[in-house]
């Protein structure tokens, strides 16, 4: 039995080494941020909901985070901001994958920008007076992918996350389009 476990571990190491050898392209965008986003966790309201609903919430709900200080960043030559008070849940990684890929880990910055873009269908310039204009779901998914590649350098991982978004992201996109959130009301 131990040979199987060691074999799987050795296979994963060799596979990681091979992927790393070919995972050396230049990112599509230049991303910069002077600091990490300042954020606080929000509680998951499970108290008083009953046993079964509490279990369901535990299995299906993701923790939400609130930005506590305007977070400034740049993509290529544009400078943008995620305003204080914005609430997001990070990269929507299915719970069964979170042991290996945390939504608040290497996908954090791209996930934050992506969540803002999904909610408002645009990115907010640092002046807080104008936006990039309406973006498509695919455009926001590409921003997520390209920012994360620029931040963490993992092409294969970020392309896998990108294709996951292309397959399942339409649910969140449609939910936000139905809510019709206005960025001006939230700054």
Language model features with spans:
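Extended terminal accessory/targeting regions
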Residues: 2-187
């Amino acid at each position: 039995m131990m040979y199987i476990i060691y074999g799987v571990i050795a296979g994963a190491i060799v596979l990681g080494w091979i992927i790393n050898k070919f995972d050396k392209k230049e990112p599509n965008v230049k991303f910069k941020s002077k600091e990490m986003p300042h954020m606080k966790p929000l509680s998951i309201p499970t108290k008083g909901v009953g046993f079964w609903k509490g279990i369901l919430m535990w299995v299906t709900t993701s923790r939400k985070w609130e930005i506590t200080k305007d977070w400034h960043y740049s993509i290529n030559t544009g400078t943008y901001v995620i305003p204080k008070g914005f609430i997001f849940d990070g990269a929507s990684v299915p719970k069964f994958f979170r042991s290996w890929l945390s939504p608040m880990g290497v996908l954090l910055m791209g996930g934050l920008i992506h969540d803002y873009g999904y909610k408002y269908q645009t990115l907010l310039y640092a002046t807080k007076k104008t936006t990039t204009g309406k973006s498509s779901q695919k455009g926001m998914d590409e921003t997520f992918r390209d920012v994360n590649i620029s931040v963490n350098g993992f092409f294969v991982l970020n392309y896998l996350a990108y294709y996951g978004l292309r397959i399942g992201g339409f649910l969140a996109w449609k939910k936000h389009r139905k809510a019709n959130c206005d960025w001006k009301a939230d700054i």
